[in-house]
UniProtKB/Swiss-Prot annotation:
Name recorded for this polypeptide: UDP-N-acetylglucosamine 1-carboxyvinyltransferase 2
Biological processes annotated in GO: cell division; cell wall organization; peptidoglycan biosynthetic process; regulation of cell shape; UDP-N-acetylgalactosamine biosynthetic process
InterPro entries assigned: Enolpyruvate_Tfrase_dom, Enolpyruvate_Tfrase_sf, MurA_subfamily, RNA3'P_cycl/enolpyr_Trfase_a/b, UDP_GlcNAc_COvinyl_MurA
Superkingdom to which the source organism belongs: Bacteria
Subcellular location: Cytoplasm
EC class of the enzyme, as a word: transferase
Binding of phosphoenolpyruvate, residues: 22-23
Species annotation: Lactococcus lactis subsp. lactis (strain IL1403) (Streptococcus lactis)
Length: 421
């Protein structure tokens, strides 16, 4: 079993480069199926979710050239066929549901195992099902999978109102509708940068998507799509994770390859705490920060504070002075990091799905386990802050979403290693 071991309490300095966005690339790779051609993706992070997606694509018949050291995937989908996808790989991957939209759009049918990923409480796919049904597909629920197929000759554009703002459902609807007949309008669409990124790729492939990044998206379906080249946007969640770490333990750290506009609400909270920042065109310098103030955080859909960043910022909050709270309105059960931080000495608890902390706390190294991707990131930061040695298990969650995390942290002075036990 692989574990991460951190000897904490050491200040850090230097530069941390940000990789391509995990939450984009997990949709971009399935989206290439729509092209029936060769698509090149640049800036692809070297994470286990990408490896799983590549393996699934190859099972479907895609020919893929991988150079993840340079962040490049060349995907030829001309030989792809719609076939039942392997339950094991699908079950480990939340974003597997994007295969539904892509396969339905190109082939008019899809059979995909039920998605897995991190256990953050209920994340129903009802919105996806409702959208596919509105476009003219029916669902047949099987034991460990769902089968979708078009009723009639093809999907047909329509107006779809999202009852809840959902990134996954917005992207999935966009993928399927891009090959439907006529106009599809998505109302109450999610507005995340990753949606714009996916729309940019499929537009470059010949789709006609307008309004991505607003709450109304219009998609005019096309009969066929072609190859393209696309560079993945920087990962705003990885950037936020390292910004919080730099604020907690940095003696001057530069986070490179950042789009500031994607992180405005997060950066506003750092500044409210008293973190010193210099914002440049594509980088952010975090100055040594002391006498931090506690803040209250509520995660909401973009452009508000991202749910994926409420866990990574928590160790920084534990260095501030005063009492504060964290409320996650997206995933109320996203609190599994709390008992692990308490094990390290944090004065933190959960009350009615609200996280309450009293700070500052002196953290001490301990044996802890990552229960999901962003909880794992929080524990890495906590281990760097803590005195003594921290040993983190279940690190496969962390490797799902953080590209070369050991190497990046080692380069700025963190005593961290990956071990086999």
């Amino acid at each position: 079993m692989k574990k991460i071991v951190i000897n904490g309490g050491k200040r850090i300095s230097g530069t941390i480069p940000i990789s391509g966005a995990k939450n984009s690339v997990v949709a971009l790779i399935p989206a290439t199926i729509l092209a029936n051609d060769v698509v090149t993706l640049e800036g692809v992070p070297d994470i286990s979710d990408v490896a799983s997606l590549v393996e699934i694509m190859e099972i479907m018949g895609a020919k893929i050239e991988r150079n993840l050291e340079e962040g490049r995937l060349v995907i030829d989908t001309r030989s792809v066929v719609s076939r039942p996808l392997p339950y094991g790989k699908i079950n480990s991957l939340r974003a597997s549901y994007y295969f539904n939209g892509a396969l339905l759009g190109r082939f008019g049918q899809a059979t995909v195992g039920l998605p897995g990923g991190c256990d953050l409480g209920p994340r129903p796919t009802d919105l996806h099902d409702k959208a596919f049904k509105a476009l003219g597909a029916k669902k047949i629920q099987e034991e460990e999978a769902e089968h979708l197929e078009v009723i009639g000759d093809s999907l047909v554009g329509t107006t779809i109102y999202m009852d809840v703002v959902s990134v996954g459902a917005t992207i999935n609807t966009m993928l399927a509708a891009s090959r439907a007949k006529g106009l599809t309008i998505i109302e109450n669409a999610a507005r995340e940068p990753e949606i714009i990124d996916v729309a940019t790729l499929i537009n470059n492939m010949g789709a006609q998507v307008r309004g991505a990044g607003t709450d109304i998206i219009r998609i005019t379906g096309v009969d066929e799509m072609h190859g393209a080249q696309h560079t993945v946007i920087p990962d705003r969640i990885e950037a936020g994770t390292y910004l919080a770490l730099a604020a907690a333990m940095g003696d001057g750290v530069i986070i490179e390859n950042v789009i500031y506009e994607h992180l405005e609400s997060f950066i506003a909270k750092l500044e409210e705490m008293g973190v010193g920042l210099t914002i440049r065109e594509d980088s952010i310098e975090v100055h040594k920060s002391e006498n931090l103030k506690s803040v209250n955080i509520t995660s909401v859909p973009y452009p508000g504070f991202a749910t994926d960043l409420q866990q990574p910022i928590t160790p920084l909050l534990l260095k501030a002075k005063g009492r504060g709270s964290i409320v996650d309105t997206i995933y109320q059960k996203r609190v599994n990091h709390v008992p692990e931080l308490a094990r390290m000495g944090a004065n933190i608890s959960v009350l009615d799905d609200r996280i309450i902390y009293d700070a500052p706390n002196e953290l001490t190294g301990s044996c802890v386990q990552a229960t999901d991707l962003r909880a794992g990131a929080a524990l890495v930061t906590a281990g760097i802050i803590a005195s003594g040695t921290t040993k983190i298990s279940n690190i496969e969650f962390i490797l799902r979403g953080y590209d070369h995390i050991i190497e990046k942290l080692t380069a700025v002075g963190v005593d961290i290693q990956l071990i086999e036990e």
